[in-house]
């Protein structure tokens, strides 16, 4: 049969001429005896069942089809799949071959093995003309293939819009839409709408919905909404919801469309779909009260009385768009109708869609608008300062993530228990005159003239049907002409209590994109007074908690996602809310605030707890006064810092002290310094006296104010009636004369500190004194070590100190890189800034010394404040370590009288550390948090760099005298009180002054038993550093230091006289060795014109196995040291005095007290000549070093200033 195969190949290749030759040979039969059986078989089929006519139909060649049909080729021959030539012609899509086959009487409804007729193929591939031809030849559009699909199903599945239109225009349209030829119980049952929704064909869906297909038809997978949601077709979901699909229908797996999205989809589109589905759950259901139709409006909905209407949206022109489903006929109608003809019959949990919706006028006429009463009490003032800073910050609850949705509008989910009517703009709202009278709006921007108190919002299911939240927010915004943003707040899920938590980022997210409007709204938000709407007691369960928050619609959502109890709901985060589908910013904030309140209630905090509202101005001042002298502290709850750490006892008592006296608002030097710095740095700020604080008179207002959006650490307490036991600030008297202008270098460094202090804080606190009975200390509160609580919690009694907190905003922008560390000095508590100083302070101290400024030595006694005065120009000493480590060194205390006398004589520039061990520093200093370089002399560079020639000459002469006195250090009187072991006292050491010139110490001194104190100095209690250059030099043996090997070891056992003598000899030898080695690197800072003998106290610092002696930058003169004090003397720094005698130590023992040391005098004039020359050389070397370091500091200051600019 080779000829038949040749024919098939010729047809397959489309060779019409070869086919004609083949057919011509066998067209006329020859009358031969044996030739009649050799006729050509035109219906021959190959291995796949294809005949020549199959190939001709598939190729679409009409000539070949005609030739084969003339040869009587079988038109309905089937291949291996049961496909006929008409199937292939319909699949190929050319109408002429289809017509030829149909004229040849091809079967139009013959099905293949898979049940498909030619119309299935034509419809699936969108061949409109072929489909039309088949339909004209009575093809059955309701024919179902083995996949239970009709040609319409295939056309809808593949989005063949024209074919769908063609099929739906046929006489079998109703049957196609109803699926009468299908078995609904079949697992493969589906509808055209399901297939179109699954594949996202919007136009096909619109055609089907237009022609009335049942939108809620359920298959095994659910409704068409289930299919679209599962496949991530956001626009289809939206279209179906708009056309009234029931989002609560469950499939055979008991899943709603939202359940499917939550469980099976992770795409970005699923987020929008979740939102749409949640919105749809809050669609309003109404019942028609009377018939309605409008023949002149094609978009009007024909309504009969009693029809159930699903409200889809509320149009800006006042009409509502609704959907009516007729279960009997299986049809759905969508159109517009007036809201006056319906009544509400159901309120689903959730809210309306975030569309442009207005409150209909009839509801305002029928319902009473919630009023905002304005209380006009005689003499009442607004309870908030006019200068209150209301700008929100990043740390408010929920705002750390508000930037995520900027510009998105925060599409919404449930608004409390039911539907809130959204308002597009206030112009479309048709309030009646009587309603405007009831709704008392603010007479203008709330600027402090009246107390505008908004009553707490009671939430019940009927409130939001009247648009109560919308009306409240509208009345509030209308007071300052911002009513156009009502819809923004409502659609984002805000009510008035939650609006008070709004930050500028949140305003941007909800659509307030104009900076001026954001600023105005933020200002007015700060002046709102409204209950926080948070639980006042621990809820019973999750439902109770959500009900108190007014968000019970989320109970099911939270429960289904694993938050079934209060213990688990406290772990909610913003990410968790996003994951479970709560996207409305207002609801996120309220839930997270509710979690915070729940935690506070569980921890036993008072109502308000850590969510207390914080309102402060740009530089308000709150006075903090120490407890009374008797030490009695009021019984109040413990106060916490913004890190959650407990405040020191002094601050606890000060912040909770009653109104025993009015705190004077005297302008402090620190505030002047802040003002001067801000003028130079571009941060112009008003002083604390810019606005007087008005008295507050609140009537019936809940004082549990919510948290304000201000930087953490600025939790200031509202005064007078706002917070009990507050303190009112009075208008300030005229400011004292301004301080001298600051140098630019120090100013730049200070700006760096203000912007690089606390990474997560917007502002830094300035601490300064405001009292009149004691001298003030001006310091900068910087980062606490490790963000922990204060180290020394017990204040010193009978030392009244008033401190005030002022606020200065730091500059925005990325922080500059940290300065280079210059040393490895550290302590167990972390680096404390007491021992650091700026260039300005070093120079100022040396200038004062050069002019001869000193202390009057008649009655003053050196306290811990003097120890820290010059700490900026030297390393940390024992006294500083005791302050920074919270009193680890147990050292003697002075009496109250001595401290008060010395405090009264301190100059204004005296600076010290507070007794609370707060890491204070000097005013204007502590600008660069760095440690000194290992060389001991490299922190005095700025002092020498700014000295005048006269001061330099004084410096050289002082160096000469220093060498003379350092050699005779053993001859100086040293009084060391050593006692048996007893509990350590958390206090600072008392430094005793040196006796006057010519005075001789008594042969023996007796110390009473009650004056005894411990001296416990171990390496673990002191500051640890790497060995300095000086210390390395000490390791090389020298002739005078041959026996200088023992070290000071703390003794915990009773000491005998012999032991004491041996230990004192060791101390003396160590002092001498260190004095000789350090004389080349010590700075001079002594009064050159004083007539008394001035000494510089040196404090013992442990560094490894060695002991280093440090001296302060200021000399102190005074009488004999009092009993109970500790004094280590290194070398005197007198520059031009005549020293005729040097004390020499001797030892005596007292019967009633521990051994003490007295001294005799020794003439040392011959040592002056031998030391003078080497001293001058050392001074010159030191000056060169200081000049180099000064240049380095200048470069660093310029670099920091450039970074800040």
Swiss-Prot record:
Record has Ribosomal protein as a keyword: no
Question: SH3 domain spans which residues?
Answer: 281-347
CDD domains in the record = SAM_caskin1_2_repeat1, SAM_caskin1_2_repeat2, SH3_Caskin2
Any matching Pfam family: Ank_2
Q: Which domain of life is it from?
A: Eukaryota
List residue spans for each ANK repeat: 48-77, 81-110, 114-143, 147-176, 188-217, 220-249
- List keywords of the entry alphabetically: ANK repeat, Repeat, SH3 domain
- Biased composition, Low complexity: where in the chain? 666-687, 908-919
The SAM domain covers which part of the protein?
468-531, 537-601
Q: Does the keyword Repeat apply?
A: yes
Q: What InterPro entries has UniProt attached to this entry?
A: ANKS1/Caskin, Ankyrin_rpt, Ankyrin_rpt-contain_sf, Caskin1/2_SAM_1, Caskin1/2_SAM_2, Caskin2_SH3, Caskin_C, SAM
Q: Where are the residues of the annotated region Disordered?
A: 377-411, 666-689, 784-964, 984-1054, 1132-1155
Q: Where is the composition biased (Polar residues)?
A: 377-388, 398-411, 823-840, 942-959, 1042-1054, 1137-1155
Gene3D superfamilies in the cross-refs: Ankyrin repeat-containing domain, SH3 Domains, Transcription Factor, Ets-1
Q: Where is the composition biased (Basic and acidic residues)?
A: 1009-1037
Could you tell me what this protein is called?
A: Caskin-2
Q: Please name the source species.
A: Xenopus laevis (African clawed frog)
């Amino acid at each position: 049969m080779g000829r038949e195969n040749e024919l098939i190949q010729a047809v397959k290749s489309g060779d019409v001429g070869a086919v004609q030759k083949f057919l011509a040979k066998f067209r006329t039969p020859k009358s031969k005896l044996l030739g009649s059986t050799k006729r050509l078989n035109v219906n021959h089929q190959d291995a796949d069942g294809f005949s020549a006519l199959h190939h001709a139909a598939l190729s679409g060649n009409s000539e070949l089809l005609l030739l084969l049909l003339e040869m009587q080729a079988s038109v309905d021959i089937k291949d291996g799949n049961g496909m006929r030539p008409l199937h292939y012609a319909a699949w190929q899509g050319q109408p002429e071959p289809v017509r030829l086959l149909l004229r040849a009487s091809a079967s139009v409804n013959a099905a293949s093995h898979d049940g498909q007729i030619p119309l299935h193929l034509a419809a699936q591939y969108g061949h409109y003309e072929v489909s039309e031809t088949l339909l004209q030849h009575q093809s059955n559009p309701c024919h179902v293939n083995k996949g239970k699909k009709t040609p319409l199903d295939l056309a809808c599945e593949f989005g063949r819009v024209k074919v769908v239109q063609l099929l739906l225009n046929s006489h079998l349209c109703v049957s196609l839409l109803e699926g009468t030829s299908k078995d609904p119980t079949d697992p493969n049952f589906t509808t055209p709408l399901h297939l179109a929704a699954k594949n996202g064909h919007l136009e096909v869906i619109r055609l089907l919905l237009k022609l009335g297909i049942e939108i809620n038809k359920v298959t095994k997978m659910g409704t068409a909404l289930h299919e679209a949601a599962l496949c991530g077709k956001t626009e289809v979901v939206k279209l179906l919801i708009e056309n009234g699909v029931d989002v609560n229908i469950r499939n055979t797996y008991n899943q709603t469309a939202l359940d499917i999205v939550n469980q099976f989809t992770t795409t970005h589109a699923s987020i929008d779909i979740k939102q749409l589905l949640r919105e749809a759950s809050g669609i309003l259901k109404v019942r028609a009260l009377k018939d309605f139709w409008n023949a002149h409006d094609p978009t009007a909905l024909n309504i009969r009385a009693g029809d159930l209407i699903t409200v889809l949206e509320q149009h800006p022109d006042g009409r509502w768009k609704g959907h009516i489903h007729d279960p009997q006929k299986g049809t759905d109608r969508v159109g517009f109708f007036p809201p006056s003809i319906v009544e509400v019959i159901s309120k689903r949990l959730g809210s309306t869609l975030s569309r442009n919706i207005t409150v209909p006028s009839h509801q305002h006429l029928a319902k009473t608008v919630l009023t905002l009463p304005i209380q006009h009490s005689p003499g009442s003032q607004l309870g908030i300062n006019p200068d209150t800073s209301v700008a929100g910050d990043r740390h408010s609850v929920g705002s750390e993530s508000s930037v995520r949705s900027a510009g998105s509008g925060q599409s919404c989910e449930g608004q409390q228990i039911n539907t809130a009517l959204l308002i597009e703009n206030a112009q479309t709202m048709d309030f009646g005159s009587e309603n405007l009278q009831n709704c008392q709006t603010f007479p203008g921007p709330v600027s402090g003239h009246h107390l505008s108190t908004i009553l707490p919002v009671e939430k019940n299911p009927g409130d939001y049907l009247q648009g109560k939240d919308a009306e409240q927010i509208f009345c509030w915004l209308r007071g300052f002409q911002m009513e156009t943003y009502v819809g923004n707040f409502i659609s984002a899920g805000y009510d008035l209590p939650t609006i008070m938590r709004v930050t500028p980022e949140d305003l941007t997210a909800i659509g307030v994109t104009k900076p001026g409007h954001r600023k105005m709204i933020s200002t007015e938000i700060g002046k709102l007074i409204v209950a926080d709407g948070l639980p006042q007691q621990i809820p019973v369960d999750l439902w109770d908690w959500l009900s108190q928050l007014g968000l019970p619609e989320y109970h099911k959502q939270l429960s289904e996602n694993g938050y079934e109890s209060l213990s688990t709901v406290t772990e909610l985060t913003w990410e968790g809310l996003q994951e479970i589908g709560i996207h409305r910013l207002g609801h996120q904030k309220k839930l997270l605030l509710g979690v915070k309140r729940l935690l506070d209630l569980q921890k036993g905090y008072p109502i308000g707890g850590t969510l207390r509202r914080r309102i402060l101005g740009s530089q308000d001042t709150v006075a903090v006064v120490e407890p009374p002298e008797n030490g009695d502290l009021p019984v109040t709850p413990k106060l916490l810092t913004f890190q959650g750490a407990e405040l020191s006892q002094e601050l606890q008592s000060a912040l909770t002290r009653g109104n025993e006296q009015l705190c004077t608002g005297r302008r402090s030097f620190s505030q002047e310094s802040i003002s001067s710095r801000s003028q130079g740095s571009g941060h112009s700020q008003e002083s604390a006296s810019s606005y007087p604080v008005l008295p507050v008179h609140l009537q019936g207002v809940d004082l549990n104010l919510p948290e304000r959006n201000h930087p953490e650490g600025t939790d200031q307490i509202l005064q007078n009636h706002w917070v009990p036991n507050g303190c009112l600030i009075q208008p300030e008297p005229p400011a004292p004369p301004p301080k001298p202008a600051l140098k630019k270098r120090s100013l730049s460094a200070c700006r760096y500190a203000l912007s690089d202090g606390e990474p997560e804080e917007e502002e830094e606190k300035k601490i300064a004194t405001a009292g009149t009975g004691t001298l003030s200390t001006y310091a900068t509160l910087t980062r606490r070590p490790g963000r922990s609580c204060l180290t020394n919690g017990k204040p010193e009694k009978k030392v009244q100190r008033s401190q005030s907190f002022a606020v200065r905003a730091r500059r925005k922008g990325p922080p500059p890189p940290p300065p280079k560390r210059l040393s490895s000095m550290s302590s167990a508590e972390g680096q404390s800034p007491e021992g650091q100083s700026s260039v300005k302070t070093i120079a100022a101290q040396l200038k004062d010394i050069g002019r001869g400024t000193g202390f009057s030595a008649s009655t003053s006694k050196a306290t811990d404040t003097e120890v820290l005065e010059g700490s900026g120009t030297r390393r940390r000493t024992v006294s500083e370590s005791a302050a920074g480590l919270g009193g680890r060194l147990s050292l003697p205390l002075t009496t109250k009288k001595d401290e008060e006398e010395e405090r009264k004589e301190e100059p204004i520039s005296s600076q010290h550390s507070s007794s609370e061990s707060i890491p204070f520093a000097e005013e204007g200093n502590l600008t660069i948090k760095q440690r000194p370089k290992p060389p001991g002399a490299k922190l005095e560079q700025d002092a020498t760099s700014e000295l005048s020639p006269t001061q330099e000459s004084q410096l050289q002469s002082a160096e000469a005298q220093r060498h003379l006195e350092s050699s005779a250090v053993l001859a100086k009187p040293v009084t060391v009180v050593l006692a048996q072991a007893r509990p350590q006292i958390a206090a600072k050491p008392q430094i005793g002054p040196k006796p006057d010139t010519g005075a001789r110490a008594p042969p023996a001194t007796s110390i009473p038993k009650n004056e005894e104190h411990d001296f416990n100095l171990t390496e673990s209690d002191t500051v640890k550093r790497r060995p300095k250059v000086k210390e390395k030099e000490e390791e090389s043996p020298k002739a005078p230091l041959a026996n200088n090997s023992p070290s000071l070891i703390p003794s915990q056992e009773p000491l005998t006289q012999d032991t004491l003598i041996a230990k004192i000899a060791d101390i003396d030898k160590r002092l001498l060795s260190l004095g000789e080695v350090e004389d080349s690197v010590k700075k001079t800072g002594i009064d050159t014109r004083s007539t008394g003998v001035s000494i510089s106290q040196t404090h013992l610092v442990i560094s490894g196995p060695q002991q280093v002696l440090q001296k302060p930058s200021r000399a102190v003169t005074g009488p004999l040291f009092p009993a109970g004090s500790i004094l280590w003397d290194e070398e005197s720094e007198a520059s031009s005095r005549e020293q005729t005698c040097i004390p020499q130590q001797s030892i005596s023992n007292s019967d009633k007290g521990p051994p003490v040391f007295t001294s005799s005098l020794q003439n040392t004039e011959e040592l002056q000549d031998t030391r003078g020359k080497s001293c001058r050389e050392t001074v010159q070397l030191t000056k060169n070093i200081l000049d180099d370091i000064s240049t380095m500091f200048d470069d660093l200051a310029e670099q920091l200033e450039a970074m800040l600019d």
